[in-house]
């Protein structure tokens, strides 16, 4: 439940009675393993003296060979059967949406359909920096992001990096990365420069959700390993550099049948369109009713830097459908013609929907959850996150909506089915249209409008996690057997604990860099300036020393101010120990510790702009962002 890939290696070696060894591996060992389950985050599910855990082969995800080892994707659970990983709940959520989607499809006469699955194509953003420069930055080494750094003269203002020509070292890295991913069966499809300097993106071909999740975990691991071969470091943190865009992960999600039909693709017949509209309404209903869970699924200390910062979607969850589909829903809701040239009302199951070419509307990059022709693009995920959490929520919430639809329609006489269906879709649109917003999500006016509509605006991870154990959320997961209540409570504890630990590590790193690197360096530079000033006056009493005098005064004043901020951060960290609950600690870290960290950074970044380059103790933003050529 750390969100990263775990490994355990078993050899084929076995002893024989005569003291020799043979190579064998039993089917039992293949199907089930027994690793230690106490050393991972478990949220109280396992104690140190309760170490037994089990791995179980996931036969729906491909085995592969990596570094001459046969790697078998597995689920991980405790001795008592509680899920200790992100794979098990994902597989359960896929079963849930399969069950409920099949009920709905049978109502439309899809007798040849035997299963439904969700598919995902996650786009992965990342930064590349030079290894030698990375090694000189404690903050990057310890936390994955820069905790200090003045804005360089040039950032992303010229928009010249996005889709720009790829630099030779980066191109060589991408070529080897593609080759390594293809060897593992990961179909990397697209790569390009992103908006910020040194930022890039990789996108694979979509596949079944649990396989896509495994592939994305592997992709992040391989990206970092290949980078080292090229003297680079791949940064996956959501916000490694202040002042330029951070990195996210777009989760392109759809639903398809075993016959190859995409259930989010408008059909060619009235009946097929009625089916599409019902599934569309299920997604709309799910996103509206469980907007808090979707926000929680992407909540992390790193992602808090992105959401709502005019580089990523706002923290308010909303849906973008595009103008054409919006007009269709409006026509159904109000029983009016879809087009002013038509005189007949739009009726579900009677009319053929107009075709929706994928390029008829601009892609709304400010929307957290956008319809893009035959899929939804969930854009709130952070770049380091496992895509499992978001897809567990999405699958389960849509399964619940489909269950309610099936409960309403099953048993309905054939002669009244279309009328009941039309009413159901119409009522769903009326009840959940507040979640649909096709405008600019970066506009402050939208935040006010969202509040008026009653949408949640959970701005930080502690604020979001406070709703994780709401009664409706527990009921959702337990009713579909995706999580037990015990498993939910353990995950809540793990998420809070992780948030606190991340901010604590960042704060301690800032203090370490300030006291051991920045303050001594600036003091040395001020001393050198003072020495230069005294030498000039000794050689020529009339010499103008105003530059040195003014700069020494300013450096001394700012150094004293920064030292005061260091002590303030230390005092603030000490107060955390006085708080008993994880909830209180997480909120304190967000409201008090994080604020003290920002205050400390302001002073340090100003000192960087005044200190000579040869005295500054670590590489600058200019070095890092433009150092790979």
What positions do the PLM features span?
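Short acidic/glycine-rich loops and adjacent helix/strand connectors
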Residues: 1-49
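Short glycine/serine/proline-enriched coil/turn segments at secondary-structure junctions
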Residues: 7, 243-246
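Short, well-ordered loop/turn and helix-capping segments at boundaries between secondary-structure elements
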Residues: 18, 285-293, 400-411, 520, ...
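Short amphipathic alpha-helical segments with coiled-coil-like heptad repeat character
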Residues: 21-22, 134, 231, 261-262, ...
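Residue-level signal for pocket-adjacent positions within structured domains
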Residues: 25, 364, 498
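Glycine-rich, acidic/polar active-site loops that bind/position phosphate-bearing ligands
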Residues: 38, 47-236, 245-248, 254-493
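Glycine-rich N-terminal segment of FAD-binding domains in flavoprotein oxidoreductases
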Residues: 240
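C-terminal amphipathic alpha-helical interaction region
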Residues: 428-629
